[in-house]
Amino acid sequence: MKPENKLPVLDLISAEMKTVVNTLQPDLPPWPATGAIAEQRQYYTLERRFWNVGAPEMATRAYRVPTKYGQVKTRLFYPQPDSPATLFYLHGGGFILGNLDTHDRIMRLLASYSQCTVIGIDYTLSPEARFPQAIEEIVAACCYFHQQAEDYQINMSRIGFAGDSAGAMLALASALWLRDKQIDCGKVAGVLLWYGLYGLRDSVTRRLLGGVWDGLTQQDLQMYEEAYLSNDADRESPYYCLFNNDLTREVPPCFIAGAEFDPLLDDSCLLYQTLAAHQQPCEFKLYSGMLHAFLHYSRMMKTADEALRDGAQFFTAQL
């Protein structure tokens, strides 16, 4: 689609979203011109520092957990001594960017609002790790904490998965993996999904939206996919194209959040319509005037804070 035919997104977003877009960080270096992933990761981590300031203080612990691929870093947030459940958080970043630091504020707020222990899993990024390694690492971490729950003072009788963007796909894929392979890590009480991608190859929103402001042009999406997948056949895997999985039975309750000007919005809409049509418990909420990745900006935007509160409230209602 010719760029000129796309919607003038930056003219249409909300006032608070425009404030975020226009926020300058004087000490931030320019986006790396080489395109090297290592440099992009470093830039992303630096850029997110500003947005992670001022998060709630709470007991926090860092542990490395074993997987068949080696050890994976995790970060545990304890908002209270007696948590009613444990929520595993998977960060976004197109499978190639992001870490526990870039999403620290999101995890702290989620722990504070839910009063549940939140465990961030620093799964191995792509292209170093290819599908389905990240999912297998997440599942291995869940199993490890389930077996060692007493040692870590966590409640693993009820768990949940949460994630943004690529992390949302990993969250739902991990929940389906546990179901399909009959792995017991505790009851999956809910899944929280903020503006994820779930397997659409094309859509109206992917055509009309996406640009340099969100890194989600069709070319960008293709690049993320090629970095993540092992081969072309993986595109149809039920753990990548989640619409190829069985969404008619035993899907944990899903909170599905969409951003109005997100190219991936149709993925969320289709997921909600599919689950609702088959009487699977789910809730969809559209956040008006928002761009993809708006969850990061709760330091400045009430809507981002609201979206985190909504997800936390949905999860605690399932307990």
From Swiss-Prot:
InterPro entries from the xrefs? AB_hydrolase_3, AB_hydrolase_fold, Acetyl_esterase, GDXG_lipolytic_enzyme, Lipase_GDXG_HIS_AS, Lipase_GDXG_put_SER_AS
Q: Which Enzyme Commission number(s) are on file for it?
A: 3.1.1.-
Does the keyword Nucleotide-binding belong to this entry?
no
Keyword list (alphabetical) reads: Cytoplasm, Hydrolase, Serine esterase
User: Which compartments is it annotated to reside in?
Assistant: Cytoplasm
Q: Where is this motif: Involved in the stabilization of the negatively charged intermediate by the formation of the oxyanion hole?
A: 91-93
Does this entry carry the keyword Hydrolase? yes
Name any one GO molecular function. carboxylic ester hydrolase activity
Kindly identify the residues recorded as the active site.
Answer: 165, 262, 292
Matching entries from Gene3D superfamilies are given as: alpha/beta hydrolase (3.40.50.1820)
Give one Pfam family, short name only: Abhydrolase_3
Enzyme class per UniProt: hydrolase
Provide one Gene Ontology cellular component: cytoplasm
Q: Kindly give the PANTHER family that the UniProt entry links to this protein.
A: AB HYDROLASE SUPERFAMILY PROTEIN C4A8.06C, ALPHA_BETA HYDROLASE FOLD-3 DOMAIN-CONTAINING PROTEIN-RELATED
Described by its record, this protein's role is as follows: Displays esterase activity towards short chain fatty esters (acyl chain length of up to 8 carbons). Able to hydrolyze triacetylglycerol (triacetin) and tributyrylglycerol (tributyrin), but not trioleylglycerol (triolein) or cholesterol oleate. Negatively regulates MalT activity by antagonizing maltotriose binding. Inhibits MelA galactosidase activity.
According to the record's subunit comment, the protein's assembly and interactions are: Homodimer. Interacts with MalT and MelA.
Family in the record: Belongs to the 'GDXG' lipolytic enzyme family.
HAMAP family found in the cross-reference section: Acetyl_esterase (MF_01958)
Please give the name of this protein: Acetyl esterase
